[in-house]
Amino acid sequence: MLPKRRRARVGSPSGDAASSTPPSTRFPGVAIYLVEPRMGRSRRAFLTGLARSKGFRVLDACSSEATHVVMEETSAEEAVSWQERRMAAAPPGCTPPALLDISWLTESLGAGQPVPVECRHRLEVAGPRKGPLSPAWMPAYACQRPTPLTHHNTGLSEALEILAEAAGFEGSEGRLLTFCRAASVLKALPSPVTTLSQLQGLPHFGEHSSRVVQELLEHGVCEEVERVRRSERYQTMKLFTQIFGVGVKTADRWYREGLRTLDDLREQPQKLTQQQKAGLQHHQDLSTPVLRSDVDALQQVVEEAVGQALPGATVTLTGGFRRGKLQGHDVDFLITHPKEGQEAGLLPRVMCRLQDQGLILYHQHQHSCCESPTRLAQQSHMDAFERSFCIFRLPQPPGAAVGGSTRPCPSWKAVRVDLVVAPVSQFPFALLGWTGSKLFQRELRRFSRKEKGLWLNSHGLFDPEQKTFFQAASEEDIFRHLGLEYLPPEQRNA
């Protein structure tokens, strides 16, 4: 168990000025959000505390509740660019807040009440904005910007992701990240890219990624991307790494040994682990998309087994489905109990119940690692939670389709499921980490380390200087500790 953080670190994002709640709110119809860029963190914290002391409601994170958004040293076009990005992530029918210069807030503080909004306060432009987005409003870290599941530049981002995947197959982590980050920027743009000039000044867009986009805009295809897509190496590595239990290193070794097909693997079972044999045996089902209806059925089954094994324990869906995906290739569930320590020993009991029902085709149990809290904090991305890597035997209703096709369906299908158990004190961090996306989490850890000097992983947030852990009761608390605007799961599809 991670030790509890007994006091707020001086100067931390969780300090009183940034997060305390005033005794009363005198103006219930007004909800202010202060935008940190250009204003600065310390000044924002000071103004937040001052406004709250005078009865103003100031939001810690931008949300649909905001009625007044205040910026400093910001042009009207930059403000509108920021607004467009936020509204693209907002729920349908959400009313945009007023975009205001800092002068409105200072006058309101002086008057002791919100002053009427005049034209001189507003950061607006007449007519639709033209030209590319201001680079100032495209943050460098993916965890600083909303990235919806459905965006405007799918063809461009998918091309870069193919190059990223190919780079990963060759062990080139640097090139993989370069292409992934460029693709992530495209996903976050509020409008389609139609000219290369729109990318000028945007972060993570170097010469190579720009050249790929230019070819796609001019010709509809990129020769490099098509060459990679058609190559035997890429196709074989993609095929092998889609097998349950097979990583890049194993796939590369098989390729160098001359293996090219699934039949090649079936002919040499001595090369396979038990996990890989199970993955190969059920490969057809496991390569068929898992639908949202399958996820709902699986969650019901898991919740029943968990509830019988430990009343009061909870099961939370994570992964891509929590980010809004309607289909995927595996399902992740996070299990905890509101009383710390009660979750110990739960997973084996759950697995026994599922096996007794004939619902488990394969599972591999991984015990939690008994590392010291500080050692756990130092781990960059791999967590040490107890878990089971499973292949479920999911019953199918009569007449169900297979992967959306019209052909008859067997009575069951194999589905990849991971069950992960976390103590309740670490649950918010585990939920954040297991929700993804992979790049979003990588960027969140990088931001924590480089910008805040903190260590973040699925176990906690650690201050190496103070040697203390931050407490968090929710994902929102973690974002607040890091001084970031909260992004809901649906906006983490970086």
Curated annotation (Swiss-Prot):
Residues that hold Mg(2+) according to the record: D330, D332, D418
Main location as per UniProt: nucleus
Recorded catalytic activity of this chain's protein: DNA(n) + a 2'-deoxyribonucleoside 5'-triphosphate = DNA(n+1) + diphosphate
GO biological process terms, semicolon-separated: B cell differentiation; DNA recombination; double-strand break repair via nonhomologous end joining; somatic hypermutation of immunoglobulin genes
PANTHER family, A to Z: DNA POLYMERASE TYPE-X FAMILY MEMBER, DNA-DIRECTED DNA_RNA POLYMERASE MU
Function: Gap-filling polymerase involved in repair of DNA double-strand breaks by non-homologous end joining (NHEJ). Participates in immunoglobulin (Ig) light chain gene rearrangement in V(D)J recombination.
Family, per entry: Belongs to the DNA polymerase type-X family.
Protein name: DNA-directed DNA/RNA polymerase mu
Source lineage: Eukaryota, Metazoa, Chordata, Craniata, Vertebrata
